[in-house]
Amino acid sequence: MIARNPIKQDPAMRNTQDDHSRFLSLVLRHQPETIGLQLDDQGWADIGELLARLAAKGRNLGRKQLEKIVLDNDKQRFAISEDGLRIRANQGHSIKIDLGLAACEPPDRLYHGTASRFLDAILAEGLRPGQRQHVHLSADGQTARKVGARHGKPVVLEIDARAMRQAGLAFYRSDNGVWLIDGVPPVFIRQTEAR
């Protein structure tokens, strides 16, 4: 019988880790200038420089803490390069970034979670990336429902990805499994129950 580790993470530490994760999202997805950081064309930042600039802004974060944030993030928002020297957000950028993703074949159906208050506009106008570079889609309805619940009463939309692909629209898949597309015309969208 294997004993479970009785040590639980201190809630204060969890909040600190969550706070660091949120701030990293801000810096690596939207506003690197907040700490004077420069991202390369593919969104990568030097880890040493990132940690130094965070410290200069009073956010002391060590290399091991950063790696823990990357590994523990339930949505796998961040990636560390194979050489271990750089970090980037996997998707969700509002700044111009080329993630270097190749177009790939999506499953026949993909899903998008939103709040009910946006439904009429989406069914009339389609899905647009808004301030982000891409519309984010999930491979399953349950994940989409969770995303929609963050914004209000959740609604799950089913996307006919097969028909979109046949119409020549390109899909990309980020390193953490989120499907990305420039937009979804309303003809390919229908409301559904999460599965």
From Swiss-Prot:
SUPFAM superfamilies: ADP-ribosylation (SSF56399). It is an enzyme of class 2 (transferase). GO terms for molecular function: NAD+ poly-ADP-ribosyltransferase activity; tRNA 2'-phosphotransferase activity. GO terms for biological process: tRNA splicing, via endonucleolytic cleavage and ligation. Keywords: NAD, Transferase. Its EC number is 2.7.1.-. Removes the 2'-phosphate from RNA via an intermediate in which the phosphate is ADP-ribosylated by NAD followed by a presumed transesterification to release the RNA and generate ADP-ribose 1''-2''-cyclic phosphate (APPR>P). May function as an ADP-ribosylase. HAMAP family: KptA (MF_00299). Belongs to the KptA/TPT1 family. This is Probable RNA 2'-phosphotransferase. The lineage of its organism: Bacteria, Pseudomonadati, Pseudomonadota, Betaproteobacteria, Neisseriales. The gene is kptA.
